[in-house]
Amino acid sequence: MNKLLFTIPMVFFLSLASGQAQTKKASSTTTPKSVSVAQGEVARWAGNCLRCSFEKRAWSAVNGTCYYPVDMDMKPGHYTISRRTTGGKLETATINVAEKACVQEDITNFPKKEYVNVSPQNQARAAKEAAVVNPLIRYQSSLRPAVFDLPVGKPANSLPKGEGNFGACRTINGQPRDRHTGQDYPVGVGTPVLSVGNGRVLLAANQFYSGNAVYIDHGNGLISEYFHLKSYSVKPNQTVTKGQKIGFAGETGRVTGPHLHFGVRWHGACINPGFLLIDPADMQEVK
């Protein structure tokens, strides 16, 4: 009888000790960090960051925060991102990329016929221009330091709401065309166009599709694009400041009417420029 009474407390004690050990082990396990964004969006990882990496690409943090731009054509799925903190710690997380529905734009009775049935001469011209532009906007491992802050400035004062056509799938008179790589803003001809941040002009030229176009390097792989200008007032390698006038809005190139096409490439990714005009705290955050 006494032996039985002694055994019961011992079993209870061993069970309690085992439970405490399991609880301690569970509490020491951390939940993997992740963030979910759609194609063409930007995720961020704030807090004492030095270096950031995403899909074999790496770059410096901006003001202690890592930003991860997702190209509008990136395949939906799960990818690994990482950051190195000021304390030397390497951390990883998962970025979940969701498909972004393609807005369909069917343009009929296009007024500029040279853009409907493009001649061999203009096809050759466009190819030469693309050969100049593409190396400027693709990812580069050696980058100038960032000279911009987020959010960036507006590309025009009293900027109207964008037309929501970033990434649109387009047809012209029934013929498929490339997806739209920027955001269109319905501003009138002659509206001053402004640099959205400090930077250096990479290219200012007249192009077949983009019309009068300006490309500005803001450091850390961020390139801003301004298309269809009536005219531009800057030249390659010129240093510009945030809010500086770089030209006037117009309707040059392949357009149906006057507007400003504002585009952004960040570390080679074509992203919705609207995400750089909002408070960074409103971006999707790694948690």
Named regions from a protein language model:
Residues 15, 75, 151-152, 279:
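Local alpha-helix boundary/kink/capping signal
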Residues 1-6:
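Positively charged n-region of N-terminal signal peptides that target proteins for export
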Residues 7-15:
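Bacterial N-terminal signal peptides
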Residues 155-287:
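Catalytic cores of peptidoglycan-degrading enzymes
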Residues 17-21:
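Sec/Tat signal peptide C-region and signal peptidase I cleavage site
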Residues 12, 36, 59, 72, ...:
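Sterically constrained small-residue positions within well-ordered secondary structures
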Residues 22-103:
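Cationic-aromatic interfacial patches
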Residues 94-210:
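Surface-exposed, glycine-biased beta-strand/turn segments
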